[in-house]
């Protein structure tokens, strides 16, 4: 099971590792405290290392990354930002920031996970002093897992309600409608109708059944955050169904997840193509597409355009969440992650651009039918998914079919992003657990506990005041500010503390050649500058959260939001400070010791080829029958 290298005196691991964990030990044999099994543990620690599973096929990894990174933001946020920020002009800052910031960090996270064979926390064994980055990403992805699934619950609810002959949001007269509800959608209907002395413009200010279904039936919206109200049991059951679905997608690990994403990641593209074909055949579709792409060069000098481009890149590429490192950790050590990262980035951005044609062809039709400017119907986020599009399908023949198709696509887009996010969190969590917690059903129980905890927190979002809670999570916990902060430190640590050239050599060891020098330059200079620049702009131009342009959050609600943001951002400095204070020696000695990488077992053969094998002295077989290995570390 272990063989000795004649040249270096170092053993490498081989044989059947599935029969038991691998034991990693320090020279004193003392049990490790706090660090997990992905690397060689804390200096002088003893840890059991469960064998790490890998993707059955490399395409499983590609599909999982596509499913995770290509999500709701590509469909409901990018097209609106493109229209809002000068149409085709928006593509200039978007592409530039993708080249300088998005793609380099996307590649960095995947390659780091593949090289270290660890989840979001233990991947920073490459520089243990900055392991706070791992804790920060775990906090962020936990918040995302908690609130993101609410969109799936709402989409699932709309999907169920679409299986009717008449869509419930198409007409008034329901128990949730008010006397102000008006069913007239088409401008020509408005001109020919008896309006009780109301003009068409005045009628447009009345309540549509689409808005009343969303606010009064689905959300049962209260007056504010301070009025939580009761649970909406229909939406609660949809939420429970979504969590059960997520659990069974994740509970067996990447072997099962890698199969499910073949459907969840590809079928939305089929639906997008069908919706595009339908959309371009509608009257007014061309006008909508022109509004989507029409360049407004004056916007290029606006700082907000660059801020929106940067935050959208980091959102849509799913940077800073730790899930990409978790997915990369299941790759074969020699997988060409460089090629994969480029392909995945192109798919992500291409999907965003393509989705814009789908969305704005339908919004153009909607504006034409209502006789209004497209700015009156163009919306982003939940407003597009649950107000604008449901309103548009009521104007189409066979409306329930198009509604069901759209919400099924929405459900799949969100589902794979959700369960891969949960997978990333679980991977980081299991890597943290010490040897004594390793048992057969460890993953199944951990996933169940995670899903149950998130479901309990989600109950606050299915109350009458739940939308206000959802907006708090969305605006603060995984905001552009937190992701930019995370990305900045990732680049600084890898490029300046560990060493950009050193990491390029590590990548060359995996894929057989050094990537383009552009990646090294970006990690070292361009990307940190871009991240910090947009981060500062976000702080300077910060505006307190307002819901629906009317409800201003109370001071304690805003304080709660900043607590969400700071709970991840402070992980880096607090962990760094704590490590330096606990260590012994001069400050220089502490820094040198705490920035020394902790290598994993899979690095043995690779590191043994170097003249300077840092941190490893011997690898001794302990028990041939139990397939246990002891590695001594001088770190």
Curated annotation (Swiss-Prot):
Glycosylated. Keywords: Cell membrane, Glycoprotein, Ion transport, Membrane, Phosphoprotein, Sodium, Sodium transport, Symport, Transmembrane, Transmembrane helix, Transport. The chain crosses the membrane at residues 61-81, 88-108, 139-159, 231-251, 270-290, 305-325, 342-362, 395-415, 445-465, 480-500, 521-541, 561-581. GO terms for molecular function: creatine:sodium symporter activity. InterPro entries: Na/ntran_symport, Na/ntran_symport_creatine, SNS_sf. The modification Phosphoserine is found at residue 623. Glycans are attached at residues 192, 197, 548. It catalyses: creatine(out) + chloride(out) + 2 Na(+)(out) = creatine(in) + chloride(in) + 2 Na(+)(in). The modification Phosphothreonine is found at residues 617, 620. SUPFAM superfamilies: SNF-like. Pfam families: SNF (PF00209). It is found in: Cell membrane; Apical cell membrane. Residues 82-87, 160-230, 291-304, 363-394, 466-479, 542-560 are extracellular. It comes from the Eukaryota. CDD domains: SLC6sbd_CT1. Creatine:sodium symporter which mediates the uptake of creatine. Plays an important role in supplying creatine to the brain via the blood-brain barrier. This is Sodium- and chloride-dependent creatine transporter 1. It comes from Mus musculus. The lineage of its organism: Eukaryota, Metazoa, Chordata, Craniata, Vertebrata.
